Amino acid sequence: IDGGSSSTDEDGIISNEVIKDLRKLKEDKDVKAVVLRVNSPGGSAFGSEQIWEAVCQLKKEKPVIVSMGDYAASGGYYISCAADTIVAEPTTLTGSIGIFGLIPNAKGLTDKLGLSFDVVKTHKFADFGNIMRGMNTDEQTLLQMYINQGYDLFVSRCAEGRKMSKNEIEKIAEGRVWTGEAAKKIGLVDILGGI
């Protein structure tokens, strides 16, 4: 897996393709174990969750070992934490257990250009994410709720995969990045090495 996890990004991991490959490996009786090379800075929380689930299904049938490349951060770590064993280079950048949302705001630009927009909508959230205006308080609250739910799920997945408590994961999470060597000391990685 090389790139960010996404269901749509041309430059990232297309989660559906990865999931299809993982399912084929699960069904292939000649495959006795899977080494999954992860070199990803992260990506979509949704795509990462889908791949995480596919890795969990695969490891019910055969051992899954993750070998981390230069980085396995955020969504890259999300995917990795489902493995039976995680191997990282001493300098691998990993962890980054955190989630953020980004809604562009082009209002300043449209104001400068003298552009204005009329919006007709069915309810107050119908144009949520409209870049022609800033978010209002209700939208910020809603987005924060989604971010918090996603973060809680990410922490839970890491706790389950690493056989640690959510509290232990939260102490080393908060979006922080660790080297492979430091990650091994805190339990995010099992073995230092490479392929």
What annotation goes with each model-predicted range?
Residues 103-106, 166, 195:
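Alpha-helix initiation and N-capping motif
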Residues 1-66, 71-77, 81-161:
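Small-residue-centered hinge/linker elements
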Residues 165-193:
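Amphipathic alpha-helical substructures
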